[in-house]
């Protein structure tokens, strides 16, 4: 089973590291091409393109400028420990054992606008480049055209390496759009998380994102290898709703806390 999750905008390069092991991203040549394009942007252009404040635009212009491809533990950190967002609050990778990191390295992938695909222990330097951003490049008008089949091919390599054909899609639509399902040598299972509000179950963004991290952790901690095992997920009050589920979609619900 291969789990896909999105990256996060919030990055942590300060906290103590819980593992010293690392690998290098497999698509750094592509990342370098995107950095070359991004360096052409002025801070005001970055602000407009990413819809961020002038201050954040300045920070990210500096990140593009400072980025260099010789990654070391001194100038980069493991991706799974850098990202800090709702998904990663649920994942809590900072509490992983070395065995957890081993399993995650084989079975978890983070999709990325800049790096394409990241394994948990891949070093990364700080960046902000969301997949949906329309950054013109030599291959087209946006990052989806830039990455083309590259991300899908890399995922197929990972599936072949583990001798499996199931992808658990816990990524956002923006990021999963970078994957070509028809070219993916896998059955795609999408867990959906619904929270009750005023008597109705619906997707509440913050809770759903955190639940994607909780589900990723559940798979990693329990070393799950078959999609039917996912129905046992019960973290923080969620339960599997078979009646609402289908072959490609597993629905989990949680009652409102009263």
UniProtKB/Swiss-Prot annotation:
GO cellular component terms, semicolon-separated: cytosol
UniProt-listed GO biological process terms: response to hydroperoxide
Source superkingdom: Bacteria
InterPro entries: YaaA (IPR005583)
Signal peptide: none
Alphabetical list of Pfam families matching this protein: H2O2_YaaD
NCBIfam families: PRK02101.1-1, PRK02101.1-3
PANTHER family (alphabetical): PEROXIDE STRESS RESISTANCE PROTEIN YAAA, PEROXIDE STRESS RESPONSE PROTEIN YAAA
HAMAP family documented for this protein: UPF0246
Membership in a protein family: Belongs to the UPF0246 family.
Name the record gives this protein: UPF0246 protein YaaA
């Amino acid at each position: 089973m291969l789990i896909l999750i999105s990256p996060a905008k919030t990055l942590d390069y300060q906290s103590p590291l819980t593992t010293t092991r690392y690998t290098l991203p497999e698509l750094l040549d592509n990342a370098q091409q995107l950095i070359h394009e991004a360096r052409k942007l002025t801070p005001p252009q970055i602000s407009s393109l990413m819809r961020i404040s002038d201050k954040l635009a300045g920070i990210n212009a500096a990140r593009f400028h400072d980025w260099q491809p010789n990654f070391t533990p001194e100038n980069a950190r493991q991706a799974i420990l850098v990202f800090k967002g709702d998904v990663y609050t649920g994942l809590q990778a900072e509490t992983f054992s070395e065995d957890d990191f081993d399993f995650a390295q084989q079975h978890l992938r983070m999709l990325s606008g800049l790096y394409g695909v990241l394994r948990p222990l891949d070093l990364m330097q700080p960046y902000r480049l969301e997949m949906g951003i329309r950054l013109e490049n030599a291959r087209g008008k946006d990052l989806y055209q830039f990455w083309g089949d590259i991300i899908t091919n890399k995922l197929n390599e990972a599936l072949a390496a583990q001798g499996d054909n199931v992808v658990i899609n816990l990524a956002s639509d923006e990021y999963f759009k970078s994957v070509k399902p028809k070219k993916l040598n896998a059955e795609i299972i999408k867990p959906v998380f619904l929270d009750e509000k005023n008597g109705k179950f619906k997707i509440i963004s913050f809770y759903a994102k955190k639940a994607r991290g909780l589900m990723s952790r559940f798979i990693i901690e329990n070393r799950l290898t078959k999609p039917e095992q996912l129905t046992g997920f019960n973290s923080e009050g969620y339960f599997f709703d078979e009646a609402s589920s289908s072959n490609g979609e597993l629905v989990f619900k949680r009652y409102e806390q009263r």
